Each structure stands twice: as structure tokens, then as C-alpha cells.
Amino acid sequence: MAHPLRHVVHQGPVLRAMGSLAVQALEQRFRGVGSTPCDLEKSIDVELPPRDAAMVADYIRWTGGDRQAWKGQVPHHLFAQWALGLTHELLCGAPYPLAKAVNAGCRMEINGPIPLGEPLQVRASLEGIDDDGRRAVIRQRFVTGTPSSPNALVARLDALVPLGGKREGEKRTARPTVPAAAREIGTKLDYD
């Protein structure tokens, strides 16, 4: 892309979510992680404006795609551009340090094209949370469609949040150390 910041105006929801996450992380750091239970029945239904055609074209070019193959369509794998903005709203108040969350997987079920130039109808929902005390796996579901292509994409995002706890009865073992009397026997392995 010739102008890397050209499309930043289209990233408002994601940037707001990242800013809100940073504020939440600071609050959790100074006040402690809250204990507000997550509403597993919560879902968010929104209609988003059509994706900008120039942004989509630049995205296709940036990913090495064929613009002719995607002519008149939004690539399904661009869904994070609208889904991540909803993630924070969906998980707002979750009792987990979300700033530590890492991607634990993504599954996409493609049921049809996402036409370019049509508003997106998105339903975001929380599918479940698997918390074993050491880590929490948060499963979210995003269904995206348009008026002419409803339910075109069903995407599931999994996020893993390390909690730092230990299993019951698990003893902490000493970290392995190099003995003081050890000496180096080599520095290079030759595989020839």
C-alpha cells in the first residue's frame, strides 16, 4: 500500500476496543481483576456500513490476492476488521486479564459471498468459557451476512488467557541449573 495510514479512518471500532482494553488493563492492575460474571447469553446484533472499496482492494493486494477473483466481494478472512471491534463490547466486564489474551484459533464456515457495497449484518455472541484456574479459553462466534447474502460467514474465535494458577496438588519444582563445575565441550554442531 502506498499510504500505510490511508485506511486508519476505517479502523475506529478496533482502535476504540484496543484503547478500552488498555484502560481496563490499567484498572485491573491497580484495582485487581474484577469478579463480574460473564453473561453467556449475551449477544450483540449490529448493522455496519459497507466496507470501503479502496480499503478492500488494498487489503487484497497486500495479502497477495487476485483482485479479479474477489471482484465485488469482501474477502471472508477480513472479518477480523469488523469482529475485533465487537469483541471488547462482548467481553466487557469479564473477570479475566484480557490484555494477556492470545489467539487460540479461528474457524471459518463460509456459506456464501460477502458482497462489497452492502451493509454488514453481524451477530456476535459468547459461546463459552473454559476456565481451569491456570488458563481460560474464551470462545466467541461471529455471524456475518448482508441483505442479499445472509449468514455468509460464521466465524469462531478462541482466545486463551493465562491465569497463572497451578493445579491442585501440583508442587513447584526447582528450575534446572547448570552445575558450577560444568565446562563447555563444544560450541558448534556439524551436520555434514
For the regions a protein language model found, what residue spans apply to each?
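An exposed, glycine/acidic-rich loop-and-rim segment of catalytic or binding clefts
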Residues: 130, 135-192
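Hydrophobic beta-sheet segments that form the core/acyl-binding groove
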Residues: 105-148
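Acyl-thioester-processing domains in fatty-acid/polyketide/NRPS systems
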Residues: 2-9, 68, 108, 146-157
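Hydrophobic/basic alpha-helical segments enriched in Actinobacteria
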Residues: 44-45, 51-55, 114, 121-122, ...
